[in-house]
Amino acid sequence: FNTLRQAILKGELKPGERLLEIALAERLGVSRTPVREAMRKLEQEGLVVMIPRRGAQVASITEKDLNDVLEVRIALENVAIEKACKLITEEELGRLWVAAKEFEKTKAEGNLVRLAETDVAFHEIIYQASDNKRLNQVLNNLREQMYRYRVEYLKEEQTRNLLVNEHEELVKAIRDGNVERAQEISFNHLENQRKAIIRTIRVENEAKEDKKKE
């Protein structure tokens, strides 16, 4: 499961690429059963889609899909941040600082998949601090639907440096109970991400069109 997941996140398996059980089983040196189970898990994460009579393929995302997801996510992030500003404990605030520093440390290592995971871990603490399990679940589901593109988003050094600053500013705003400032930082964070991912989607679409013309 993790091997296939990492291959999708790193872009080794491209959006729209068919995932053949037999070929993957041979490639990984396993039977078809664990491959089939991995497909189901990846489908739940939004990384794989099952097409009738065609089988599994790496999920693609359109600009409309992305905008729909982010429209809902921005609204729910605002709720989570408002609640976190009011309810966050000293222990959670401490973990948030540690997570922000861990992101900065991982940035220096250059592992983009690991960097995306540390970014997720940072935001997960904020969701937990909101003390609403259902809200946490929905936000995690929305985040997973665009997870693959986060690695593309993190490829630019300028973006990585910006995120380090945004994380630190967000921790300070939540610590101070400054809801408006925290929500502003979160919105800018997601809007920058949206623009970067749309650039990636357009490049992918252009590549598909060029391939059709060949």
Summary of predicted features, one role per range:
Residues 72-88, 118-158, 193-197:
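Hydrophobic, amphipathic alpha-helical faces that serve as interaction scaffolds
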Residues 8, 84, 107, 130, ...:
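Hydrophobic residues in alpha-helical segments
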Residues 79, 85-103:
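Hydrophobic, well-structured mid-protein blocks that either form specific transmembrane helices
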Residues 97-104, 109, 148-214:
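C-terminal all-alpha effector/ligand-binding and dimerization domain
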Residues 1, 21, 66-69, 73, ...:
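A general structural signal for well-ordered alpha-helical segments in protein cores
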Residues 1-82, 86, 124, 198-214:
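Short linear motifs at protein or domain termini
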